[in-house]
Structures are given as C-alpha cells and as structure tokens.
Amino acid sequence: MTNSRMKGKNGELDACRALEKLFPFKWERTAQRYGKGKADIEAQCDWKIHVEVKRRKTGYSYVYGRLKSDNLIVSGSLLICRLSKLRTVMDDGVCLPNVAPRCAGLEDAILQARTDARVGWLPIVLARQDDEEWLLAWREEVDTRLMEEVRTWLDGNTKPI
C-alpha cells in the first residue's frame, strides 16, 4: 500500500473513532467493503449523510486559528466547526458566525462529497491537519436539515442496520 493510501486509511479509521465518541453507534470505512462510489466512512445505522474524509499535513492552519476564538465560522458557502464543538454549536443556536476567507481545500472536498453522494444524502466533510483535531464542514444551505439529523443521532433515535 502506498504511503498516501495508508495515510488515507489511517485518517478514515481515526475519523471513525472520533465520531464514535460523539454518536452512539459504530462507524466503518466503506472502502474495505465497497470501493468507489460510497462515502469514505458510514455509520452503522439508518442515516443519509455522505462523509468525505480529508487528512492533510498542512493547509487548514488559518481555519484552526479562527476556531480558537469562535465555535463556528463561515468560509465561502461552508460552515465549519471543530467536531468536538458540534454539540456546543447546536445548543448555543449560533446564528451569525464570523466570516473567514474561503478555504479552497475544504471547498474542493465538499464538492467531491456532493458529486459522490447518493441522491437525497447530505454531503459533509471531516478534515484534519496533522497534530490538530477534526474539523466538520458542511454547506450553509443544508444546515437546518443536517442539524435536525444530528440531533436525532445524539438523542439515540436511529435504527441500526
């Protein structure tokens, strides 16, 4: 396995572990079972979210810097928060997050997620820079629907598959 493929695999496994700390169900890499055309990782429940995982050595430093003082930022058409702050963002009802310059890497990743997602599925991106925690990015236009879905998962109202 090449170094970049191993890094991708390790990033996906790490993302699964991070999501399992937040949500009450198991996560798995899909590449092991399905290959292309599916999300990088999927929850083992009835959810309709397409998760694209990106792990980079650098490239998100500005976003991490902005998220030191804010729980949620807007970057272009994306909303971005630290995965560990998702509950805070939902509970605080943050309405007007601070605007940050566009993050091309995250915009490209969400475009890939939108292209690969099945019809009716919400595309999101989990991204992490080395030595940092996971970022969660989603399009502003799906914010309400995503938050409703996430609240359902956090309440444990999902069906295992």
Regions found by a protein language model. Give the residues of each.
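Catalytic phosphate/metal-binding cores of nucleic-acid and nucleotide-processing enzymes, i.e., regions
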Residues: 1-161
